[in-house]
């Protein structure tokens, strides 16, 4: 029996300025409460935290979720709002999507292939690059064979950057965008080079929009919140620590 498609949610939060003048002990208590709530989520659901402090001017934290139902996403956000910190967290950006196998893969296969999955499986890369995407309407009027030929070129470019893992989710009818694309890697330069090369592909001419784009750093939730609340900056987490974090909080 095929696995049910997971619902995927990207919630970018901005900490409102009044929080930053709370006494340090109050901010630390707020971080503990919020972190305990995040880490107590249902088994098997994915929830990862990323910092965007200093990398975007309009948000501080990304919470990346995957759950089996839309209701679960709603329940989680309602619980966040009930915390001490909740009233001071503004949703700066929100993208809702769903996992779905790609229609362009055909017999093209390789281990743990991203485009065939109906459930999110984060790799645990230190950096996550996220953006919503909308195609031009003319793209959907092209014959399937032309679509496929352009996507084969697209996949071939991606294969030249094996250190970058792509996670594609579909938003048709669920949110304003058509796709939400998230790339995981340990070196931003690799992603930059990949994007520059993809701009030269045939499929690129049919892109209507792929902004805003977010550069995010994977951290334990407590560290991401501490950074956002102006508390002591966390020590850099090594690759092994990041993998443990992904395994513990994503049901992996």
Task: Map each language-model feature to its residues.
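Short gly/ser-rich anion-binding loops that grip negatively charged ligand groups
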Residues: 53, 66-67
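Short, glycine- and small/hydrophobic-rich beta-strand elements in well-ordered beta-sheets
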Residues: 38-59, 87-101, 155-180, 194, ...
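Short amphipathic alpha-helices in soluble, non-transmembrane regions
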Residues: 75-83, 193-199
């Amino acid at each position: 029996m095929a696995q049910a498609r997971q619902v995927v949610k990207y919630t970018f939060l901005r900490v409102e300025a009044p929080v930053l003048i709370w006494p340090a002990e109050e901010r630390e208590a707020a971080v503990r409460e919020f972190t305990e709530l995040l880490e107590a989520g249902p088994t098997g659901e994915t929830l990862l935290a990323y910092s965007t402090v200093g990398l975007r001017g309009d948000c501080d934290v990304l919470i990346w979720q995957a759950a089996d139902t839309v209701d679960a996403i709603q329940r989680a956000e309602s619980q966040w709002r009930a915390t001490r910190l909740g009233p001071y967290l503004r949703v700066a950006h929100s993208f809702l999507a769903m996992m779905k196998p790609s229609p362009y893969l055909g017999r093209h296969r390789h281990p743990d292939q991203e485009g065939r999955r109906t459930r999110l499986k984060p790799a645990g890369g230190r950096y996550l690059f996220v953006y919503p995407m909308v195609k031009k309407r003319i793209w959907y009027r092209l014959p399937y064979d032309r679509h496929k030929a352009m996507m084969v070129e697209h996949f071939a470019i991606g294969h030249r950057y094996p250190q970058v893992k792509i996670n594609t989710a579909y938003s048709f009818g669920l949110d304003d965008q058509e796709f939400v694309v998230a790339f995981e890697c340990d070196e931003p330069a690799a992603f930059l080079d990949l994007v520059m090369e993809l701009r030269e592909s045939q499929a690129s001419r049919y892109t209507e929009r792929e902004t805003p784009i977010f550069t995010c750093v994977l951290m334990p939730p407590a560290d991401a919140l501490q950074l956002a609340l102006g508390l002591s900056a966390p020590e850099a987490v090594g690759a092994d620590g990041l993998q443990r974090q992904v395994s513990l909080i994503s049901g992996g």
